[in-house]
Amino acid sequence: MSTPPLPDELRRVHMVGIGGAGMSGIARILLDRGAMVSGSDAKESRAVVALRARGAAIRIGHDASSLDLLPGGPTAVVTTHAAIPKTNPELVEARRRAIPIVLRPVVLAKLMAGHTTLMVTGTHGKTTTTSMLIVALQHCGFDPSFAVGGDLGEAGTNAHHGSGECFVAEADESDGSLLEYTPDVAVVTNIEADHLDFFGSAEAYTAVFDAFVERLTPGGALIACVDDPGSAALAERTAALGVRVLRYGSAGGRDLAGALVGWEQQGTGAVAHIQLAGESAPRAMRLSVPGRHMALNALGALLAALQVGADPDTVLDGLAGFEGVRRRFELVGTATGVRVFDDYAHHPTEVAATLAALRAVTDQAGDGRAVVVFQPHLYSRTETFAREFGAALSAADLVFVLDVYGAREQPIAGVSGASIVEHVGVPVTYVPDFSAVAAQVAGAVRPGDVVVTMGAGDVTMLGPEIIAALQARANRTVPGAGAR
């Protein structure tokens, strides 16, 4: 297709927080479409290095003078994301100079103009489902543009400017910004109260999904997972508005466009048996990622791909090769017979789904234990869901709970990782000292165990440290190990 020209205001862009998952993706697409891009971030990262290699001018640290990084004239627009405070010196300087400041979703919406847009949202699973859809369409030869909240294993990137008509993107609901978009196809994986620090109530959180699907283009479609009560209710309300709704899931008694009729764990992958509406026999859907929740995500991605004319057999071939998304049950490595995974789960439902997949892996492997290293994310979420986190973590055999990763929040009196520990029903250790975690875990596990580090904060750094600690312990037990 012929890509529409960039709007003038996006030809010279300064991005505050350019290294973040969402912002770096937008920067990649802008650069690929010929924009001049500058930016700043608090620290160096793989994303920052990659963007510099593509031509972006990036400064580490935040300073008003960063608005002048681009040669040949002033910055036309400054873009940022909701987590950056308004007191940031670059935003203060932009207001002083009367340079427009827009949030990331506004820029993404402009970049999607002229494309057939497929968007995935929901409380859980949106990054993985979006990524599955991207891989499926790529396998079908569509070359979609895309922006997603995690790096695809196959592509090693979170965004791409493609030559095809489709644009696939993840719609983040956490701050209501998904209302900037007008999708042609919307996939909703589930709806469960979250981000109450922003929305204030479960009702307000749910309402943003209704408002989102009301923005579907004429003739557009909602694809909703009806195994989830919140998404199923949204499907009913949306259908009542006359919008085309395609339901998927395993719930009986439903008019399903796609049904998950069976699922079998196979190592760290699975085979799902699915029934598509109008077909006489079920199909086998092979996946390289574990967990029933992954099979449902893949089914939603399949239905979305079919809406733009993809061949179902080719889509299934593509899904079989899907390697996963960084930090979604990602294998970090193996040492002394212990496998270590890393996962982004930071809500009780996500924790439960990941542990179900982990349990399936350990059950197949033999007598190894499921070991979880969990870092709560946000004080408000920990306070609200402490009991639910404890119940979800109790599906493991051994649990280590770290202190809260506060991110954008200030501490709340009386709220810590210990708030969760008291609700865990299996052996659990509270480790508030981050530097002590790897050694404690390495000292507690044995060959055959499977460890998963879990959370949305810097717990992801612990996987390599645990592997190193295991290797160090093994070396100490071998006579003469390390001798010169």
Swiss-Prot record:
It comes from the Bacteria. GO terms for biological process: cell division; cell wall organization; peptidoglycan biosynthetic process; regulation of cell shape. GO terms for molecular function: ATP binding; UDP-N-acetylmuramate-L-alanine ligase activity. It comes from Mycobacterium sp. (strain KMS). It is found in: Cytoplasm. It is an enzyme of class 6 (ligase). Belongs to the MurCDEF family. It catalyses: UDP-N-acetyl-alpha-D-muramate + L-alanine + ATP = UDP-N-acetyl-alpha-D-muramoyl-L-alanine + ADP + phosphate + H(+). GO terms for cellular component: cytoplasm. Its EC number is 6.3.2.8. HAMAP family: MurC. InterPro entries: Mur-like_cat_sf, Mur_ligase_C, Mur_ligase_C_dom_sf, Mur_ligase_cen, Mur_ligase_N, MurCDEF_pg_biosynth, UDP-N-AcMur_Ala_ligase_MurC. Cell wall formation. Pathway: Cell wall biogenesis; peptidoglycan biosynthesis. The keyword NAD does not apply. This is UDP-N-acetylmuramate--L-alanine ligase.
